[in-house]
Amino acid sequence: MQHRRVPVHSLGISQIVSFGLLFYAFAQLKAPLAQSAGVSETTILAAVSGALVIQGMLALVIGRWIDRFGGLRIMQGGFLIGALGLGLLSLYPSFVWICACLGLIGVSYAMCTYEVAFGSAVQLDEPKARRNISIITFYGGVGSTVTWLSVAPMLEFFGLQLTCLGLAVLMLMGAWRFWVLGRHYQQEAPHSSLALEPFRWSILTQTEKWALVTMGSISTLGYLTFTATSMFWINLFSEKFADPALAVVLASLYGPFQVVGRWVEMKFGHRFDARLSGVVATLLMPLALTMIHSDAVEVAVLAMILFGMGQGVLTVTYGFVTNLYFRAAVYGRAKGMMIAPRAVIAALGPSLGGLLYAQGADPFLYVMTGLMLGAMLLMASLLRLPPTNEIHLQPSNS
């Protein structure tokens, strides 16, 4: 197998931009968009949820494209579509128009976020997939912080229209970067359409089926919690401490500590089974959610640190543990099978979170805690399922 140098830094920076502009930004864009369209913020969040469903609808197709054409080409198209969606969003004449723009943004989200970036890393250098995925997510960890600390002043000084146009320009720059990378790497299809290795449910082994269902369930619970909480941290802390500025700081804490978690994974994770790291990560998150019930600012700070570190390691787990059971030749389609139901259910996060949060912060946190406890138990069950990818059977690679 030919191994090529993975453009981990470009892939990592792309995740700051794509997650930040296609998801995190709507925590702050939702209010001015709702005001301009004459609808409630909950309605805008429902539209965002609908856009995220598109990832599930396209997951199987995009997974096949990753295996056939390579992840870098897919990301180029995703950034271009995202630039178009955000650019058109600046016009915001009506709620219907906003929904149409969010449709484009949903397609872009499906084509240029972690799963496609992970596919590129696995295809280019499978033996070093865990380290490369860790580096990619290391960058992505600051996406929420960079976005929330940037979008607020942009909205204040430039208004909604110019802010959306500015975000569109950043997406266009990302499309250009992946066009350059595609030419540099000359990333031909790993297999032609006729030689693409067969991959369908009926030919999977029992171990592969269990791994696929379990990882799909874990990531579904994790992303449902992630999408629900991301939209309401600022609201929750604003109400709890009656200080909007403090709320933004607290909400922004978990981004840098995702980076800390991923740094720990990069430096020390290779000493441990990636599945065990996943168990620890999923345990940190319900612990953090429980601590947030406290009225002490210091406890809230510690909780967001733990939540961020858990989320940081867990993202690496999603990307790499899949590769323990599925080789590079079928990785894209395996992820596609996992993402399809996950994306549809996780897309309900903003709207489900809105409904739960309307009942109060405590019920909201109880439900999120329960979801992550379920994810932790499922992750622990994978420890009894031996890896099947021969490349990672050596302890140093798992």
Describe every region a protein language model picked out:
Residues 6-41, 58-62, 148, 227-234:
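Extracytoplasmic
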Residues 26-30, 208-265:
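Extracytoplasmic gate region of multi-pass secondary transporters
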Residues 57-95:
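Conserved MFS/SLC helix-loop-helix module at the cytosolic interface between two early adjacent transmembrane helices
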Residues 58-70, 261-273, 357:
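Helix-to-loop junctions at the C-terminal end of transmembrane segments
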Residues 111-125, 313-326:
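Intracellular juxtamembrane helix-capping segments at the cytosolic ends
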Residues 136-186:
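Helix-loop-helix hairpin linking two adjacent transmembrane segments in secondary transporters
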Residues 144, 328-361:
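A late C-terminal transmembrane helix in Major Facilitator Superfamily
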Residues 254, 258, 272-321:
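C-terminal transmembrane helical hairpin of 12-TM major facilitator-type secondary transporters
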